[in-house]
Each structure stands twice: as structure tokens, then as C-alpha cells.
């Protein structure tokens, strides 16, 4: 296959060059390449970017209620949105299960994937078998795992120290959900006792300080241990970003992720008639938090924009319509992210380098994919997204998530996704809303 005449996003610039693809790989990049009996895609006037990577999704998750999206529908939505690789966070397994239990289950789910995929391990408890379990995950091709500071299997400071020591020895990334559980439970319990159960109290029960305290503690523990691969997921607040900026200015090494929703949506959504659909954790915040996140993107303190895609139907979300504590937490977003972020390049709010770093380069580098994915270079997988500059609006009726709605419905974008190429195969023709069902996702060892 030869992609001709496209405007190609290369590291920090856009060049009009051709891309030759053979046997799933990019084999040549240059101006006016000879055709050599190749299948030709003339992409004049269109932009070509590397396939985006979403390192934070939750498909097939069971939180007492099953998510709307299984692995097939979730990865299909990802692919239609120009995300060609996901790294999924499995849910918790039964109490006492080993570290491989949920990964093995998800390996089976992955066989239905439309795009390429990998997994993070999920660490629930720590015991004499944990180190061997982490080593087993690494042998399966997983170089990362997640721990939580809240929810059922929250970790103590002592356990965090031990996890960081193990991860340092094994050269693994630890992704952490950073919220102080004691503070949340105190606030939420008081609100529920007082009958303050409107949706806005979900946000009030998880203020920015809840996140900032946990973030500061994690950074300090990692620094004490000499661990430099802490990955802070879905950072949402100015308070947390202030702690992060101070630590980064001191030379401390760790990674920071935010999500599309925290860059665009604020907590005024919790006063709207459909407020329940915006319930997620951390919650949506205020405009000053949004401004802080964008400022820290520009300063380089934020490494990744992911989605934390965790979708539930409105039927399930409405179980919490009169009591926020009964609402399943999570929103869809895996299809919307890449289009929204690329639009910021056309709107000149992001440079080419900033966009590529946030959605492709840094996710690939941090999680061990960069030898194959994350940029348009000879020798890498031919994962490519073709954009057409065009003023448009996101329409939830056209999206592939089984949630049936989008928190970005009606959102203005400056492009549409024309085609998606997965490992050299034309997987999506968005102009025809068509997917090549013969193309299957592959597990990518890291």
C-alpha cells in the first residue's frame, strides 16, 4: 500500500510526503515515492497521524453493574475514533485471587478486539506471593500494574512502599488511582446522613484536596524509595497539579495523565437535568482546574491525555439519579478523545508535537510500545489515522459505544476521521461508516 500526497504529522511538524507500507510495517517515507504496483491511496488535502494510544480504558468491567462496553464494542469505538491501541485496566477479581487471574480472563476477552491491545495488571492485596505474581505478569508481556488508594482494595502506605520496591526491581510502571479514601468516606458519609444526595454532592465529596493529598504522598514515597516510574492516572484538579509542578521543579521523576473530560467539562454539568451521566471519579471540577490542566500541558508537566473510558447505560446510571452514592462511576470517551485533541492542532491551541506526545508518543514510551507504535517512522507498525479538516459536531447517534450517549454530544470539532489503518490494513472507512471485520486486533507484549 502506498499513501500518497498526504500531510503527515512527523514528530514536531507536518510534511507532504508519501508512506509505503508492506507486511504491516512502514517501509519507506519520502516525497513522490515510485508506485511499484502498490495499492494507492491518494490522500491529497488530508492529514495523516500515527494511530493514537489510549492507555486507560475499562472494558468488560463489573462494579456490581456490568459496563455497557465489552471488549469488542469498546475497541470498535476506539478504532472508529482513530485509536489503534488500547491498554485496558481490568476490574478487581475475587478476594484472594492471584495477580494473573484477571489478566488471564481479559486475555480471553481480548480475542474479540477490533484494535491492538494490552493490559495493566491489577494488584489487590500484597503477600508473600506478590513478587512472583508481578514477575509472572512481566513474563506474559505486561510491564505495568495498577494500585488504588480508594475503593475495596485500597493500599496502605506500607503496602505502597513495598509495591514501589518490587516495581523498581522488576522495572515496571505502577499506575495509581490517587484519592484519599478516608477523606472521601468522611465527606460522603456525612452528606448521605444529612440527606444531601443530589448529584453535585458527588463532586463535593471528592474535592481537589482529596486528590492532592494522595498525589503528594505518592510522589514523596516514590522519591524516598528511589522509584521513578510512578504513573498518576486521571489527574483532575488544580490542587493536585500544584503539588505535581512543585515536585517536577525539584527534579522528581514520575508520569502524569489527565483525561479529555477534565480538559473540557466542568461541574456545572452536575446541575443539569441529565447530571447523572457525568458521575465519574474523580469528578468534574471548576474552570480554574481546567485552566490549570491546560497550563500544565503547555509547561510539559502532563505527559498523557487518556480517557478512563468506563461506560454504563443511562438505565444503570439512573439508579443514582436521586442518590449520587448509588450511581456507577464512569463515562464513555474512547471514540471522542483523538478527534477532539487533533482539532486543537487545527485550532492552533496545541502544537503538532504537543498533540503527538499526549496521545501517541508518550503513551508508547512510558508503557513499552515505542519500538512498534506511537510515531510514523520506518520499521514501525503502520497504524495510521487520516483526518479531513472540516467543521463538525460530535453526534452521539454515530458513536459505537454501547453506552448510547456521549458527554461530548454537540461538541464542536475541526476535523472528521476519514480512514483508519491498522498494521497496514484499511480497517475503517469512516466516510462509509464501514469497518473491515476481517482485521482483528492483536495482543501487544510490552
Residues of each region from the PLM?
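C-terminal cap of metal-dependent C-N hydrolases
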Residues: 6, 319, 323, 378-444
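Histidine-rich, glycine-flanked metal-binding segment
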Residues: 1-51
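Divalent metal-coordination and catalytic microenvironments
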Residues: 6, 19, 24, 45, ...
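Histidine/acidic residue-rich metal-binding segments in metalloenzymes
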Residues: 129-305
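Short, ordered loop/turn segments at secondary-structure junctions
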Residues: 90-92, 122, 150, 179-180, ...
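Metal-associated gating/positioning segment near the N- to mid-region
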Residues: 44-112, 129
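A glycine-rich helix N-cap at a beta->alpha junction
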Residues: 108-122
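His/Asp/Glu-enriched, well-ordered alpha-helical/loop segment
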Residues: 197-227, 298-299, 303-305, 311-391
